[in-house]
Swiss-Prot record:
Sequence ranges of Basic and acidic residues compositional bias: 101-111
Alphabetically ordered keywords of this record: Cytoplasm, Developmental protein, Differentiation, DNA-binding, Neurogenesis, Nucleus, Transcription, Transcription regulation
Name of the molecule in the record: Transcription factor Atoh8
PANTHER family for this protein: BASIC HELIX-LOOP-HELIX PROTEIN NEUROGENIN-RELATED (PTHR19290), TRANSCRIPTION FACTOR ATOH8 (PTHR19290:SF102)
Stretches for region Disordered: 77-96, 101-144, 159-221
Gene3D superfamilies reported in the protein's UniProt record: Helix-loop-helix DNA-binding domain
Gene disruption phenotype: Mice heterozygous survive to adulthood and present no phenotype. The homozygous knockout of Atoh8 is embryonic lethal.
Amino acid sequence: MKHIPVLEDGPWKTVCVKELNGLKKLKRKGKEPVRRANGYKTFRLDLEAPELGATVSTTAATNGLRDRTQPFPIATPVPASVAPAVPPGGGTDTAREFRGIRAPEVSDARKRGFALGTVGPGLPTPPPPPASQSLAPGDPEAHSFREQALRPRILLCAPPARPTQSAPLAPPAAPQESPVRPAPPTRPGESSYSSISHVIYNNHPDSSASPRKRPGEATAASTEIKALQQTRRLLANARERTRVHTISAAFEALRKQVPCYSYGQKLSKLAILRIACNYILSLARLADLDYSADHSNLSFSECVQRCTRTLQAEGRAKKRKE
């Protein structure tokens, strides 16, 4: 077991100051430097002190936070009878008292949102009411005047409004109907993306009015169209088949009425028509009638020969085809 060194046995190891990058001396914060707002000095304000310096500092702080476009108001001179008498050596004590006692109140006001960066260029600050010369510093009316002077600080914490347009307003023109509905007015703290999305949504028509259909609807419609086309095609084929069968039956009935070599002989529709024409002319000649196109007044024997030549030519044509 190791021997535990005792204080008297040897010197203790010292800590090197260089390794710790030097000992830093803790400094207490002194008085804060005077801050400037828009080129004017701002001082801490005593909310309860009735001195004239409080009123002047309130006016300076309020005027410093105003819009730069507004002219700086001229300070109203206060007569000597109203201003309190300040001892020659009391100015320094009063300033120290302001720093020591009123610093928590000022820091609390900063925490509540009183900062120079929150003031927007488009948010004017109402000017404080002018100080009345007839009011004494210790009166309750003077205390209410100081409260009214502090109201602009509370108003400055409101959210910034929209930036105003620098161009002059044009005279009102005649109302014109626009296809796009106007966007609803947005609140000061609302993002501008809502108005943009509203305009984009209004520019595009509804999905129900669009000619495009959903994939399921398109498939169902195409199936119905194909079924309808197939039904129409089947009906047309049936009508054509019925027509051909009717014509074939009529020619077959006519063929049975004209002379031929045998009833089992196959004749074309054209041959049946020619034989039928010559047969009708032959019957007309028997009745002393002339049905010929050129009125050639053919004899009965000539009509019979035409029928015979037509039958022989049709028979030879059938044999060549076979």
